[in-house]
UniProtKB/Swiss-Prot annotation:
UniProt record similarity statement: Belongs to the ATPase C chain family.
Function per UniProt: F(1)F(0) ATP synthase produces ATP from ADP in the presence of a proton or sodium gradient. F-type ATPases consist of two structural domains, F(1) containing the extramembraneous catalytic core and F(0) containing the membrane proton channel, linked together by a central stalk and a peripheral stalk. During catalysis, ATP synthesis in the catalytic domain of F(1) is coupled via a rotary mechanism of the central stalk subunits to proton translocation.
Membrane topology of this protein: Multi-pass membrane protein
InterPro entries with a match to the protein in the record: ATP_synth_csu_bac/chlpt, ATP_synth_F0_csu, ATP_synth_F0_csu_DDCD_BS, ATPase_proteolipid_c-like_dom, F/V-ATP_Csub_sf
Transmembrane portions of the chain: 20-40, 71-91
Name under which the protein is recorded: ATP synthase subunit c
Listed Pfam families: ATP-synt_C (PF00137)
GO-annotated cellular components: plasma membrane; proton-transporting ATP synthase complex; proton-transporting two-sector ATPase complex, proton-transporting domain
Keyword Membrane among UniProt keywords: yes
Site annotation Reversibly protonated during proton transport: residues: E75
Keywords of the record: ATP synthesis, Cell membrane, CF(0), Hydrogen ion transport, Ion transport, Lipid-binding, Membrane, Transmembrane, Transmembrane helix, Transport
């Protein structure tokens, strides 16, 4: 915890501008990791939906609607992490 506090103190120090910029870049990179999980989850969801349609073609409308709802919910996490990364880069 002391390391985090000392890093925050370095960020606010005007003489260490490069340290602050580096911390912002690291934070934006960590926020972008959220996009990895979303892409993986959406790919698995689409694959399972294609499998389900292959096994039961009559249920394509229900499967498609459930898949779209699930992808929209998982996409919201990706959008939040993207917005945080953009805010870190352009605001700080």
């Amino acid at each position: 915890m002391e390391n985090i506090i000392s890093l925050l103190a370095l960020k606010n120090d005007p003489t260490s501008a490069t340290t602050g910029a580096g911390l912002v870049a690291v934070g934006a990179g960590l926020a972008s990791i959220g996009n990895f999980g979303t892409g993986l989850g959406q790919g698995l969801s689409a694959g399972r939906a294609a499998e389900a349609v292959g096994r039961n073609p009559e249920a394509i409308k229900k499967i498609r609607s459930l898949m779209i709802i699930g992808m929209a919910i998982s996409e919201s996490a990706s959008l939040y992490s993207f917005i945080i990364a953009i805010l870190l880069v352009f605001v700080y």
